[in-house]
Design a protein with these regions (language model features):
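Glycine-centered secondary-structure boundary/capping sites
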Residues: 6, 47-48, 103
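An amphipathic, hydrophobic-aromatic interaction surface with interspersed Lys/Arg
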Residues: 25-76
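Amphipathic alpha-helical protein-protein interaction segments
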Residues: 60-67, 74-118, 129
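Arg/Lys-rich, low-complexity, intrinsically disordered N-terminal tails that contact nucleic acids
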Residues: 1-37, 108-129
């Protein structure tokens, strides 16, 4: 297994990037499909996702869907189920790791340069150089 800690390489636009978002896989839960519809336009716009990446995005959306499904189930319980809570935490960790992999977190977006402001910081006395 590859060592995943430390500084990650910068994400760059891919020559084979998708230009149109494919429909959400039919087997995903409604919450997972909603997440697919939320993130795919961002990924397509940044040109960092290829057809080969779709399984990873599908796994990310499935993990988010599972987190929401468990949360809904736990909200109906008078006392939270610790086993369900542990399962939810594992799904959250998986979703967070996959989100970072595809540029869906603030730090990973900065590597892509997708959310960087275009304005010039020359006049900013607090700018780090």
């Amino acid at each position: 297994m590859t060592h995943l800690r430390g500084i990650k390489p910068a994400l760059t636009a891919d020559a084979g990037a998708l230009t149109k978002a494919p429909p959400a896989p039919a087997h995903l839960t409604p919450a997972a499909k909603a997440e697919w519809r939320r993130v795919m336009p961002q990924l397509i716009e940044r040109r960092i996702i290829t057809r080969g990446d779709l399984a990873g995005i599908e796994n990310y959306c499935a993990a988010i869907g599972a987190v929401r499904q468990i949360a809904d189930q736990m909200n109906t319980m008078p006392v939270p189920d610790l086993k369900l809570g542990g399962l939810q935490i594992r799904f959250m960790q998986t979703a967070r790791q996959l989100a970072a992999e595809y540029g869906l977190t603030p730090t990973s977006r900065a590597r892509v340069g997708g959310d960087m402001p275009d304005d010039d910081d020359d006049n900013n006395p607090l700018a780090v150089r």
